[in-house]
Amino acid sequence: MSGHSKWANIKHKKEKMDAKKGRIFTKLTKDIIKAAKEGGGDPNTNSKLRDAIEKAKANNLPNENIQRAIKKGTGELGGANLEEVIYEGYGPSGTAIIVEALTDNKNRTAGEIRHIFDRHGGSLGAAGSVTWMFDKVGIIIVEKDNSIDEDELAMVAIDAGAQDFSAEDEEFEIITEPSNFQEVKEAIEKAGYKISEAEVTMLPKNTIQLSPEDYEKFEKLIDKLEENDDVQNVYHNVEIEDENDE
């Protein structure tokens, strides 16, 4: 029930992506459109839409933008027909990379993603080439404070169906199956705990460490992928070092 923080790599990625306000607004808007398209425009009956709206509000996306995105997703407003596309590839030293995109033009996006891989020492792979190196899981983060009883929180999470619970330096990490992610999340919230982050993500089964030279190349590749407007998420199996330890 403990071990190396799974959230560390994700948090590092999110902080870099969220630093660009315009970039995160684009991503949040697309998340809302996708959720509304898949499950309808009512957040009371569409948990994915509810989560997308919560994230948007937490990042100060204007309510007008949120409502417009919902209407685009349900078809009330005209707009581009977004499709979800998954790309798999390799970075420096054979590192595994998964790219999730939402696009209105798959040919354009595929060409751009391939170009980024090629220019930065990587290569685009076939479907299934690296996904076997990852597990799709739900991850829920509750920040530590003196009022939280670790054993009680663990019991709430495990009783609701969580796979794993761990206490890290600054937070508690709860891992779930994607299928019961929402159920566990709601049980934790109902018990009175404040969730700081919650998402379904791809966690590498094993991480690898790179030499300083390869790590620099790898970061440039990831940065360029994340700068692409169609890219929603980038997952990889590289161990992110704590910058405070360098």
UniProtKB/Swiss-Prot annotation:
Top-level taxonomic group: Bacteria
A GO biological-process term: regulation of DNA-templated transcription
CC terms in the record's Gene Ontology section: cytosol
Record keywords, A-Z: Cytoplasm, DNA-binding, Transcription, Transcription regulation
GO MF term list: DNA binding
SUPFAM superfamilies: YebC-like
Subcellular localization: Cytoplasm
Chain residue ranges for the region called Disordered: 1-21
One Pfam family cited in the UniProt record for this chain: Transcrip_reg
Matches recorded under InterPro entries: Integrase-like_N, TACO1_YebC-like_2nd/3rd_dom, TACO1_YebC_N, Transcrip_reg_TACO1-like, Transcrip_reg_TACO1-like_dom3, YebC-like
Family statement: Belongs to the TACO1 family.
PANTHER family recorded: TRANSCRIPTIONAL REGULATORY PROTEIN YEBC-RELATED (PTHR12532:SF6), TRANSLATIONAL ACTIVATOR OF CYTOCHROME C OXIDASE 1 (PTHR12532)
Protein name as catalogued: Probable transcriptional regulatory protein Teth39_1009
Lineage: Bacteria, Bacillati, Bacillota, Clostridia, Thermoanaerobacterales
